[in-house]
Amino acid sequence: MDSSKKTEVVLLACGSFNPITNMHLRLFELAKDYMHATGKYSVIKGIISPVGDAYKKKGLIPAHHRIIMAELATKNSHWVEVDTWESLQKEWVETVKVLRYHQEKLATGSCSYPQSSPALEKPGRKRKWADQKQDSSPQKPQEPKPTGVPKVKLLCGADLLESFSVPNLWKMEDITQIVANFGLICITRAGSDAQKFIYESDVLWRHQSNIHLVNEWITNDISSTKIRRALRRGQSIRYLVPDLVQEYIEKHELYNTESEGRNAGVTLAPLQRNAAEAKHNHSTL
């Protein structure tokens, strides 16, 4: 297909990245290869958007550390970069709003890629982490331009897809908007049955043409949870995370028993918010 007729795509990965691993980076490469192989798409950008501290996940270390590690991990990539907008929000931001934010930036032509975290100093960049907070307020939605706008799609693993069924973790209207208006590129792991999960969900089945399942033939079972466990036990994580990330973790002694206890006993932000909204809606019936 003529490259001018291909749909341009921006891959967006949201998550904790606690810490970022080589597997996170592989997701982008796998998705890019798959989308290009269809002959219908041209992947022009990859975005890593770490969740903010308000997510309140157990063991989640401060966002500025996770941002810096993600910047270090993508330092040599010419197409995958880190965006700090979600991390800088005072409250937890729903994934659909992050997708919408980036789509609107592309539509209005205000996309300023490549973007770097102010916490990671580069030549000519002297801004501090706190300096960017003044720019962190959500922008008002803008009317999209009619043509030539790249499509933002959510890049994820099968675990995120299957999390759609966890009560109060996602709002049904958000799931519908994600799969209908944006689309998913899901990297499947061994042991997962993403196709069956789609079949069992009316919403996902209805929009299955906008859900791309990518088989990971070279299996890789690296996860942030396993990385943190190894670090707590004093075991090596070399070759599981980029070298610069390993050096940063060791320098700042980031993951230990104490850090794993952060937010212990605290309800995850989406569960708390969605349960409260459901209770309110029920009481008003």
UniProtKB/Swiss-Prot annotation:
Residues that bind ATP: G15, S16, F17, H24, K58, G157, A158, D159, T225, K226, I227, R228
Lineage of the species this protein comes from: Eukaryota, Metazoa, Chordata, Craniata, Vertebrata
Broad enzyme group: transferase
Protein's name in the database: Nicotinamide/nicotinic acid mononucleotide adenylyltransferase 1
Locus of motif Nuclear localization signal: 123-129
Region feature Disordered, mapped onto this chain: 109-149
Assembly mode: Homohexamer. Interacts with ADPRT/PARP1.
Regulation: Activity is strongly inhibited by galotannin. Inhibited by P1-(adenosine-5')-P4-(nicotinic-acid-riboside-5')-tetraphosphate (Nap4AD).
Metabolic or biological pathway: Cofactor biosynthesis; NAD(+) biosynthesis; NAD(+) from nicotinamide D-ribonucleotide: step 1/1; Cofactor biosynthesis; NAD(+) biosynthesis; deamido-NAD(+) from nicotinate D-ribonucleotide: step 1/1
Chain sites annotated for binding beta-nicotinamide D-ribonucleotide: G15, S16, Y55, K57, W92, T95, L169, W170
One Pfam family it belongs to: CTP_transf_like
Cofactor note: Divalent metal cations. Zn(2+) confers higher activity as compared to Mg(2+).
GO MF term set: ATP binding; identical protein binding; nicotinamide-nucleotide adenylyltransferase activity; nicotinate-nucleotide adenylyltransferase activity; protein ADP-ribosyltransferase-substrate adaptor activity
Entry EC no(s): 2.7.7.1, 2.7.7.18
Required cofactor(s): Zn(2+); Mg(2+)
Gene that this sequence comes from: Nmnat1
Protein family membership: Belongs to the eukaryotic NMN adenylyltransferase family.
GO cellular component: chromatin; nuclear body; nucleus
Induction: By neuronal injury.
Catalysed transformations (reactions): beta-nicotinamide D-ribonucleotide + ATP + H(+) = diphosphate + NAD(+); nicotinate beta-D-ribonucleotide + ATP + H(+) = deamido-NAD(+) + diphosphate
Gene3D superfamilies: HUPs (3.40.50.620)
Biological role: Catalyzes the formation of NAD(+) from nicotinamide mononucleotide (NMN) and ATP. Can also use the deamidated form; nicotinic acid mononucleotide (NaMN) as substrate with the same efficiency. Can use triazofurin monophosphate (TrMP) as substrate. Also catalyzes the reverse reaction, i.e. the pyrophosphorolytic cleavage of NAD(+). For the pyrophosphorolytic activity, prefers NAD(+) and NaAD as substrates and degrades NADH, nicotinic acid adenine dinucleotide phosphate (NHD) and nicotinamide guanine dinucleotide (NGD) less effectively.
Modified residues (Phosphoserine): S117
Comment field (misc): In strain C57BL/Ola, an 85 kb region on chromosome 4 containing Nmnat1 and Ube4b is triplicated. The N-terminal 70 residues of Ube4b becomes linked to the complete Nmnat1 protein and encodes a fusion protein located in the nucleus which is responsible for the Wallerian degeneration slow (Wlds) phenotype characterized by delayed Wallerian degeneration of injured axons.
Source organism: Mus musculus
Keywords in alphabetical order: ATP-binding, Cytoplasm, Magnesium, NAD, Nucleotide-binding, Nucleotidyltransferase, Nucleus, Phosphoprotein, Pyridine nucleotide biosynthesis, Transferase, Zinc
